[in-house]
A protein has these predicted regions:
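Conserved, well-ordered alpha-helix/loop/beta-strand core segments that scaffold catalytic motifs
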Residues: 1-28
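Beta-lactam-recognizing serine transpeptidase/beta-lactamase-like catalytic domain environment
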Residues: 10, 35-87, 91-188
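Short hydrophobic alpha-helical segments used for membrane anchoring or interfacial signaling
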Residues: 29-34
């Protein structure tokens, strides 16, 4: 019979718990099993009642969903594209170590900001007075932004893009959901 060979990895209690935590907010949470890649929970809020579509949605209800400033029809978990923030740092570290751009012993001084050569703009670290002299291990421990700005700059956009692509940046996850969007990974 149709559908009898479909097996889900969703954990219903975890899914419901996350939905409760996110109630009233605009957010997304995806929880996966690191051993299998199976999706344990995938939550996007706000959501909507899918039963509205079962027998054909009224134009009034559909207009309300389309015009809702909280955009409940957008699945933030699969269609949202977000800056990776500090989660990118371990990948930059592995990439730079593997490419020979840095070693475990490479140190850089972090004054609390980083400046792109030829630019006046300073990119501030979360710790405004800086972290001082850091190697890659300490930079990860302290989540030092400027260390990774410099290392990424030293890698160059082509090499950085190639390495980040190996970790899945800029690619689809393969979750088998038609609405999924790939992330952005800049290239030259």
């Amino acid at each position: 019979q149709a559908g009898h060979d479909i097996y889900l990895t969703l954990d219903l209690k975890l899914q419901q718990y996350i939905e409760t935590l996110l109630a009233g907010s605009r957010a997304a949470v995806v929880v996966t099993d690191p051993r299998t890649g199976g999706v344990l929970a995938l939550v996007s809020t706000p959501s909507y009642d899918p039963n509205l579509f079962v027998d054909g949605i009224s134009s009034k209800d559909y207009s309300a969903l389309l015009n809702d400033p909280n955009t409940p029809l957008v699945n933030r978990a699969t269609q949202g594209v977000y800056p990776p923030a500090s989660t990118v740092k371990p990948y930059v570290a592995v990439s730079a170590l593997s490419a020979g751009v840095i070693t475990r012993n490479t140190t850089l001084f972090d004054p609390g900001w980083w400046q792109l050569p030829g630019s006046e703009k300073r990119y501030r670290d979360w710790k405004k007075w800086g972290h001082g002299r850091l190697n890659v291990t300490r930079s990860l421990e302290e989540s030092a932004d400027t260390f990774f700005y410099q290392v990424a700059y030293d890698m160059g956009i082509d090499r950085l893009s190639e390495w980040m692509g190996k970790f899945g940046y800029g690619h689809y996850t393969g979750i088998d959901l038609a609405e999924e969007r790939s992330g952005n990974m800049p290239t030259r």
